[in-house]
Curated annotation (Swiss-Prot):
Cofactors (names): Mg(2+); Zn(2+)
SMART domains per record: RPOLA_N
Protein name (record): DNA-directed RNA polymerase subunit beta'
GO BP, one annotated term: DNA-templated transcription
Amino acid sequence: MNELMKIFGQVSGTQSFDQIRISIASPERIRSWSYGEIKKPETINYRTFKPERDGLFCARIFGPIKDYECLCGKYKRMKYRGIICEKCGVEVTLAKVRRERMGHIELASPVAHIWFLKSLPSRIGLLCDMTLKDLERILYFENYVVVEPGLTPLKIRELLTEEQYMRAVDEYGEDAFTAKIGAEAIRDMLTVIDLETEKAQLKVDLKETTSEAKRKKLVKRMKLVEAFMESGSRPEWMILEVIPVIPPELRPLVPLDGGRFATSDLNDLYRRVINRNNRLKRLIELRAPEIIVRNEKRMLQEAVDALFDNGRRGRAITGANKRPLKSLSDMLKGKQGRFRQNLLGKRVDYSGRSVIVVGPELKLHQCGLPKKMALELFKPFVYSKLELYGMATTIKAAKRMVEKERPEVWDILEEVIREHPVMLNRAPTLHRLGIQAFEPVLIEGKAIQLHPLVCTAFNADFDGDQMAVHVPLSLEAQLEARVLMMSTNNILSPANGKPIIVPSQDIVLGIYYITMERDEVPGQVLKIRSMDELKGAIANNAILFYCPTDPNTKIDTKDLDTLLDRLASRNVTAHRRVNPSSKDALEAGLKGGHLRLFNVEKPGVPLVFADVNDAEKAIKDGKAILFKVPVFVNMAEIEEALTEKTITLHTKIRARFDTVDSEGTPVTQIVDTTPGRMMLSVILPKNKNVPFSLINRLLTKKEIQNVIDVVYRHCGQKETVIFADRVMGLGYSNAFKAGISFGKDDLVIPPEKETLVGETEEKAKEYEQQYQDGLITQGEKYNKVVDAWSKCTDDVADAMMKQISSLVPGKQINSIYMMAHSGARGSAAQMKQLAGMRGLMAKPSGEIIETPIISNFKEGLTVLEYFNSTHGARKGLADTALKTANSGYLTRRLVDVAQDAIICEEDCGTTNGLTVSPVIEGGEVIASLAERILGRSAARDIVNPLTGEVIVKAAQMIQETEVELIDAAGIETVVIRSVLTCDSEEGVCGSCYGRDLARGTRVNVGEAVGVIAAQSIGEPGTQLTMRTFHIGGAAQRGAEQSSIEATFDGTVQVINRNVVVNSSGASIVMSRNCEVALLDINNRERARHRVPYGAKLLVDEAQKVTKGTKLAEWDPYTLPIITERAGVAHYVDLTEGLSMREVVDEATGIASKVVVDWKQQPRGADLRPRVTLRDEKGEELLLANGLEARYFMSVDAILSVENNTKVNAGDVLARIPRESSKTRDITGGLPRVAELFEARKPKDHAIISDCDGRVEFGKDYKSKRRILVVPEEGDAIEYLIPKGKHISVQEGDYVRRGDPLMDGNPVPHDILKVLGVEALAQYLINEIQEVYRLQGVKINDKHIEVIVRQMLQKVEITDPGDTTLLVGEQVDRVEFDIENSKAIREQGRPASGTPVLQGITKASLQTHSFISAASFQETTRVLTEAAVSGKVDSLQGLKENVIVGRLIPAGTGAVMNRLRAIAAKRDKDMQVEGESEVPAIPPVAEGSAPEAPPAE
C-alpha cells in the first residue's frame, strides 16, 4: 500500500487546496497567529543595526536575522536547530521565517475597523441601524449613545450630547441607564445583537412594510444578518481589540549608504499606533482626566484608520516628504497594487528583448535569434550539455568557457536550440496572436528577425518596433508552445475565422503585378534568325510592323534598310501574321483559340465574327488580320520564352495546368492565362477543390486571403504553410523585378475637377440666396451646402480614379493605382487627397466646416485652407493618445467579465436558439445569412421548403457545404444554437458555441471562449483608435439618405400604407411604420425599406419596378408635421412671446415663427401649443379615426402656415429641423460600444411601448406630456415624455409592442423587459457590429453573444414562491435554478423572476469569485463585502487560479484538473482500502504532509 503511494506521490499537500475562504478575524484568531506582542515603537538600534527587543523588528518575536544563528551569537549552525537561546530569546532557525511570522498589538481601547465602518454601505451602521454620521459622532467622542435605557424615557440608540448626558444623569441617577461613548459603546451594541431574533423581527417588518424605500433597506439588513449567521462571524469582531502586525520582511527597513535608512511606510504607520497606544495605557494607569484620555483614544482610532486605509477619513497622513503614506489598502489597490502588479502580471526569467528586422528568407515557423541573445537565454542548457560531453568538468568551468565564447560553445548552442521553440511577444498584446512560438535560427547581429507573414498578427512593422523573447523551459511548456502556439498553428484569426497569415505590402504588389493581364499589341513578337528569313517573310506578307509608341500606326515596309535600322533601335515592333492554309484550318484554329482575329485599324481590339465565312471575307478585304496566341506545353517553355522576351509576364497565352481529380489521379487542363499566373499555379497545392480559376484573375490582397482560405479548408495546415511561404517568395522577387515606384506625374488631377467645383460653387451660392430669401433656415442651408460639397468631393475622386485606372495599350499602368487597388499600400481616400480635392474638414467638436478645401496636396493648399486643415489633423493626433487608453480599458473590462466563460461540456442538449436572418440596411445585404450561420449548430432541423428534405439535422454543425445548400434552397431565416440560450450550469457547451474560429473545427472542451471573445472585440477597438490620424482629419460623411431606390427588379408591396394626396398630386405617407418591400418572381421578399413619415411615395402596391427606380423621397433634414384634411389652420396656445416668437434672421431680415420652450415662464405652464383645423364655420374638423384634427408642436418647430389660412390635405404645417449628422469615426464608435456593453441609458433615449395598442394623449403633467397606449383589453399604460422632445406618434396611431414613441436610441433594459432576451441580443449585436462595420472590421457574432451572456447572468425575483429568496433580490441564474429544483423536490411552489441586464463592470464585480472581483476594481469594497459574508472562492475562473498560482482550468489545465480530480479520488479510495486492510497503520504515507485545511 505504502509502496504504491510512493510511486504515485500523494495528490494533496500544502499546494492542493480547493477553495479559499475569507472572513473577519476574531481577536482570539489574531492572537493565535501572533508570535508575540509588540510593545515598543523602536525598529533597530542605529549603532549595532540589531533589531530592538519587543520592537517592530524584534528577533525574539519574528525570528533570527541570519540563518541558524541567534541574535547574541551564542548558538550558531544547523546543529542547534530549534533551540531557543536563553540569553536573547531568539529561536535558532531559518531567517526566512521573518517573512511568515506575525506579531500583534494589544489595544488599550477598542477601535472600529475603518473598512466595515466607511465602506458603503456601512456594515456597522446597517447592523446597528444607525447612520454613518451618528456612528462617527460616537466613535470620535462627540456624542454618547444610550446602550441600555433601563426604566428611563430614553430610547435605545439615542444620541446624547455631553450636556444632555449630564442632565440625564442628574435626573435619573447614574445607575438608571447605561450610555457610552467611543468604540466601546458600539462594541457593546454589537455584542448584544442576537442574530436569530433580529432575523425573525426583520421578516415580520418586511411583511408589514408598504414603502418601497423601507423595504429595500430591510432587505439589505436581512442579507447582512443572514451573511453573519452563515459565516459564523460575530458582529463585534468588526471592532478591533488586537491589531495584527505583518511580518518584518514584508515591510523591510533597508540601510542606504550614508547611514540613512529606506523604510516601508507601514513601519511609520505601525509606529504611530504603538506610540499612541502606549501613551493611552499610561494615561489610563495615571487616571488622567477623561478629556485627555478621550483625545488620546480618538487619536488612536485615527492612527489605526490610517494604517488600514490612509486617506479614507479626513486628511491623509503624510510622511517626511509630504506625500501620503501607503497604507495596507493601498498595497492591494490599483494597477500598482498587489493584485495587478505581482499576482496577475509577473516578470519572468529567461527573457530578452531587441529590435526586430524583416527576415524574408525564414520559413513561417522560424525566427532569427541573435547569437549573443541565444547564448544568454539558453545558458543553463549549454552548461549541462558541456558537462555531459565532458568538455567542462564543473559548472564553473563551463561558465568560464561560455564567458570566453569558445568556438565549441557555439556548436553546443546550435544543438541545444534545435527544435527548442521560443516565444516572441510584441506589446501591446491585444489578442492571443500577440504571443507566438517559433523555432530559433541563430543569426549574426543584434536584431531579432521576424517572418513577414506574421506581422499582421503582431501588428508589427519594422520602423523600430521591439519584441520580447521568452524561453519555455519544461518539457510540457515546450510541448504546448509547439502544439498550440507555433505560428504555423495560428493561420486563422480567432475573431472572424479568416486567415491572418496573409501577405501584405510588397508581397501583395508583386503578386498583383504578375497576375495582371495586358492587351499589349496582340500576337507574338518576332525573333528572326537570319536576314533571308526576314526578307522572305516580308515578301510573303507574313509580317506586320508597328510603331511601339503608338501601336495603331502601321509602318510601311517598302524601304528595307530604314526598316532594319528602326527594328534594331526598337522603334518598330514586328508581329507575325498568320495566313490559314484552308477554311478547315481556320475553323479549327479559331475554335481551339490558337488564333485570334484583330482589327487592322486598331490592332488592340479583338473582333468577333458570327461564322468562319465572315472571318474569311474580312481577311480577304484586309479588314482583319489573324494573330497567333502563343501555346506552351509546360513551365520550362514559358520560362524560356520569358528569357527570350518573346512574351511578357502579362501576355495572353494558353498553357497546361496539372492538377488531380477527386480520386487523386493527375489530370491536365488547358487554360487561357498569362505567364505570371502560370508561375503562381506551380506553387498552388494540387487538389480538386482548388481550381485554376481561383488564381486565374487579378489577385488583390482580399483575393489572396481568399486563396489561402480555400487552400487551408481543402488541403490542410501543412500545405497552407508551404504555400504561404512560397507565395511570399514569389511576391518579393517579382515586386523587386517589377520595380514599381511613382513620381509626381503619377498623381493625375482629373480635368473635370474645375467644372465640378464650379458647379458646386454655383449650387452653394444658390442655397445662400434661398436662405437670404427666407425659403430655408440657416441649418437647412448648412446641411445642403455640406451635402453638395460631399458629393462634389466624391465626384472628383471618382473622376480621378477613372483617369488613373484607365488602361492605355502600350503605356505602363499607373503605379499609385496599382498600389492602392492591390491593397498593398494607400487607399482611395488618400489618393483623393493627393490628386482629387481634400474636401470638407471637421472641427474638433465633430462639426463640419462648410468651406471645403478645394486644392489637393499636389497643387498645394492655400494658407487659409492649410489653417482649416490643421484643425482636424491635430484632433486626430490628440485622439489617438487618449483613445488608446480607453480602448485598453474596454478590453480589460471585457476580459474580466468573460474570463470564466469556458467550454465545459460537449452538448447541453437545449433546443432553444436565436433566429438569424441576413442583415439588410438601406436595401443592401450587409451580412448575408451564409456568413452569419457558418460554423454554428442548428437548433432545429433545417428543411428545404420546396422538397421537404432535411439539409441540416438539429444540433449538427453548419459547414461550408451545408451553407451552399441552404442558400440554394432560398431559406431566409434559420434558428441556430447560441451561447445566450445555452443551458450549461458552469460555462458554455460546445454545441451552442459551434466552430472554433481559429482552428476551423468544432470547439474543444476547455477552450476559454470568453477571453477569446473579449480579445476579438477589444483588439480592433485599439487598432481603430490608432488609425484616425492617417487621413488627417478629412471629414468622412456620406450625404444623408433622402430617397429609396429599388436594388433590383421586382414587384412592390406597401406595408401599413396610409397616404394622402396633396395639392400637387403627390402621395404623402402619413403612417409612422410604412414599409416598402420588393418581391422577386417567386414572391420571396428580397428587400424591405422603412419609409419615413412625410415622404413622397412614388410607387404603388403591386407595381413592377426595375433596378434603380426611385420608390420614395423626402427631405432628410426636417421632420414635417402634415395635415390629413383640408381646412382652415388656427393657432391654439401659440402666443407671441410666450410659446412662439418671430425670429428675424440677421443675415436675411426675414421673419419666421418658431415655437419656443413655453415651460420657462410660469404663465406658460399649462399651454399645449397646437394648430387646429376648422371648417369655414369655425367648427373643429374630425380626422378619419374620429379624433379632432389638432397637431401638437414641439420646441424649435418652424411654422409653415399663417394663422387662419386655408390648407390642403398633405400640406406641411410646420417643420422640425434635425441636427446635421456629425462625422462618424470610431471615436464616436468606441464610446458607443462601451455604452452598449455597460448597458447605460443613452443620453437622449427613446421610450418604447410596452404593448400593442392605440395612442392617446392624456392630460399634461408639469413639464412632461402624458401619452397613453390603450391595448385591446386591459388598462392603458401611460408614459411621461419631456415636452420639448418630438413625439414620433400621433393621436390615434396604432403602435406595436417595442415601437419607439419618440426619437432616439432605445434603452437596452427596456428592450429586454418588453421584447425579451432574443430581441435584446439582436439589438446589441447589430448595434455593436454597426460600429465595427463602419471601419470595415469583421467580428463574428458569437463573440458578442458570449459577452451578452455574461451580462445576463442575474435574475430578479418577482415572486419568491416557497423558496428562501426575497422579492426584488438579484440572484445568479444557476443559484435560481438550484433553489427552484429544491422547492419542487419538496413539493413547493418555485420562484419566478425576470432576467436582468448588467453592464460589464457591474457583472464582473458580482462574480462568484471574490478574488477575481477584488483584482478588477474597488478592491477594498469587494473584500469588505466578502469578509462579512464569509465568502468561499471555489477557484473556478481563470483569474483566481492565476492569482493563487495554479494551472488555469482551461485548455491543457482543464485536462490536468480532470486528471487531478480522478487521482484525488483514487487516493481516497486507496486510503479507505488501506484502512480496511491494515487498521494499525496510520493512513498518512511517509514523507508526505497531512491533509491541509482550506487556506484562510
